Amino acid sequence: FHKEKYHLLRLTLNGAEAVSEKFTDPAEAEQAAAMCKGAAVTCTSVTKEQKKEQPPKLYDLTTLQREANRLFGYTAKQTLDYAQSLYEKKLLTYPRTDSRYLTSDMAETVSCVIHLAAKLPPFDGCSNFFPLVETMISDKDVSDHHAIIPTMEIEKADIKALPLGERNLFLLVCCKLLCASAEPYVYEAVTATFDCCGHSFTAKGKRILSE
């Protein structure tokens, strides 16, 4: 397997952009560009498909370490140390877990925690927020310890007083909890194909239906 260079033509249509098929020959691409410049364009097909993306799962230790590294550059040990310190301060649940779900007996508690987290900056701009707890519950997917979430203690905690690393990690866990309790992201994927001088161009877009 080896990479092969190719060229694409881009067609601007009322603010949208359609992309041509691949040209491996530069001369052929230039010829097609010359032919299409100022030429008539015909829409040959439009397809629409409704798609749904489920909310993300909660953090276990591994996924928390990965995301903290990607966003903040923290090492796995740094993330564990910050999470352990937050656990000892009773702001996060036990961090050494391999589960990304909660148990059914936590449903009422986590609902309260979600509403508390939604009041914290920078999440306090959320309005009309109705969390869905059911998607986070799975008794069979929890062995020794459930997923990492904030605790009820956040109601009286001074988050701004936390050291930067701990504060970043704490807000990251809060953000994941809020995202995990959101409704599915539903959108309509639209694909349109166009013909210009015998060359095919494709434009793709989406229309948000629910988020």
Question: Which residues fall in each region the model found?
Answer:
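Core catalytic DNA strand-manipulation module of type IA topoisomerases
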Residues: 1-211
